[in-house]
UniProtKB/Swiss-Prot annotation:
Role: Prevents the cell division inhibition by proteins MinC and MinD at internal division sites while permitting inhibition at polar sites. This ensures cell division at the proper site by restricting the formation of a division septum at the midpoint of the long axis of the cell.
Taxonomic lineage from the root: Bacteria, Pseudomonadati, Pseudomonadota, Gammaproteobacteria, Pseudomonadales
Protein's organism: Pseudomonas putida (strain W619)
GO biological-process terms attached to the record: cell division; regulation of division septum assembly
A Pfam family: MinE
Protein name in UniProt: Cell division topological specificity factor
Family membership: Belongs to the MinE family.
Record SUPFAM superfamilies: Cell division protein MinE topological specificity domain
Keyword Cell division found: yes
Cell division keyword on record: yes
Length: 84
């Protein structure tokens, strides 16, 4: 490094390296946000089919949430039942 390099500062990054870095940040963020297991939509569909055998409900009436608390996972199932 000579004296002129010091005054010029760092070299600019290429647009490809900047884009790659941004993409890596986005992918890491998306992976961190993804807490829903792959089987959850299939589980919701099957539960809806079983419940429909006994009660007339729509697909929007069943809500499933999976919450992770430390080493425990909590599966919460909320069903909105129609008035009789």
């Amino acid at each position: 490094m000579n004296l002129f390099d010091f005054f010029r500062g760092r070299q600019k990054q290429t647009s490809a390296s900047v884009a790659k870095e941004r993409l890596q940040i986005i992918v890491a963020h998306e992976r961190g946000q993804r807490s829903e297991p792959d089987y959850l939509p299939a589980l919701q569909k099957e539960l809806l089919e079983v419940i429909r055998k006994y009660v007339n409900i729509g697909s929007d009436d069943v809500h499933i949430e999976l919450e992770n608390q430390g080493s425990c996972s909590i599966l919460e199932l909320n069903i909105t039942l129609p008035d009789r």
